[in-house]
């Protein structure tokens, strides 16, 4: 949990031991205003190293850490694909190369957590026989400009096959 600042040696051990880290992208954009000062430039290179971990063959279980963080899936998705704060700011040395593709970010909050909890047969994808938990937005998060992600509105939420919210 909170695999935010792990050394290269620890990253290798994650791979060797097939550890699935749990990370909260909103922590990265919340921390960017002070993390470099607290961790220093050497250590910040390994902070929130999503790309490094995925490129080594790991999956990442994403979470919101609510109620510590807001718990808004748009913020988590935006943070994962931009590594910028809600105003579009990113700090020098913040390693934008560690951001995820939109497809990876989607998996970070769907199938990868299901795999991490050994529930991929029941969760993580929309298929017959699965729980069918999902939200639909009024904009396509996979294709709109990144600054528009936060403007998308939830128009439908389904939990366990039942509509729990509809605009």
Regions found by a protein language model. Give the residues of each.
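His/Asp/Glu-enriched, well-ordered alpha-helical/loop segment
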Residues: 8, 12, 16-141, 147, ...
């Amino acid at each position: 949990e909170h695999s935010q600042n792990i050394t290269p040696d620890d990253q290798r051990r994650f791979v060797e031991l097939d550890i699935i880290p749990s990370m909260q992208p909103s922590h990265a954009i919340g921390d960017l205003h002070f993390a470099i000062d607290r961790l220093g430039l050497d250590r910040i290179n390994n902070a929130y190293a999503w790309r490094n971990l995925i490129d080594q063959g790991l999956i990442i279980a994403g979470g919101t850490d609510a109620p510590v963080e807001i718990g808004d899936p748009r913020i988590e998705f935006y943070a994962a694909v931009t590594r910028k704060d809600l105003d579009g700011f990113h700090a020098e040395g913040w390693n934008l190369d560690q951001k995820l593709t939109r497809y990876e970010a989607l998996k970070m909050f769907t199938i990868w957590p299901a795999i991490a909890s050994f529930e991929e047969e029941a969760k993580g994808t929309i298929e017959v026989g699965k729980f069918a938990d999902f939200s639909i937005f009024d904009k396509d998060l996979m294709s709109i400009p990144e600054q528009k992600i936060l403007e998308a509105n939830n128009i439908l939420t389904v939990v366990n096959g039942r509509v729990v919210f509809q605009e």
